[in-house]
Amino acid sequence: KNEMGRKLYDFHLHCCYITGLLHGDPQNGNYLFKRDQIILLDFGNIHKLSLDFRKNYIGFLRAIENVDMTAYQFYGKNLGVLTTEDDQEFLAKHFALATAIFSPFDQVGIFPPPLDNPLHLIHQFVKGIKLKGTHRPCGELATIDRTHLGLYTKLRAWNSHLDWKGPKDRILWEFENNLK
């Protein structure tokens, strides 16, 4: 399960950031898992992530990792999750939520998916804010979040022990290096 989990994670990262072609429905019936390979069976829900989206999403992830609130606000606005009208309290809560969800995957080492239920964190956040009349994030963000959650759920069920940071850092470096 660790080796298949690593392959699935590597495939996911490559699709998200290098090709920009993302499978939007990563449930079990859409993959065939064999001893030494993963075969994608269903191509009916493939989404193209724009170059601008990928740049902004990576900037957003880097802002979380570097605890850079200025960059977080900049990229959050570009992704449609933050606006210029958001007050400091909302920004602080939003940053705390994003940090709770993403920063465990920035730790060095090999370990299983670190969160029991990331949706619980989101539910707690949403309970404390007024949603009526608020903005909506871009569709690409919803697509990548859904795919991340599907991957996370699969790897959690397998209890795959992975190096989360190393492969992600290599893929993000490759993406950024290809921009030069």
Predicted regions and their residues:
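Conserved helicase/translocase P-loop NTPase motor core
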Residues: 3-19
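Conserved catalytic-loop position in the HRD/HxD motif
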Residues: 20, 25-27
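Hydrophobic residue at the +6 position relative to the catalytic HRD Asp in the kinase catalytic loop
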Residues: 29-33
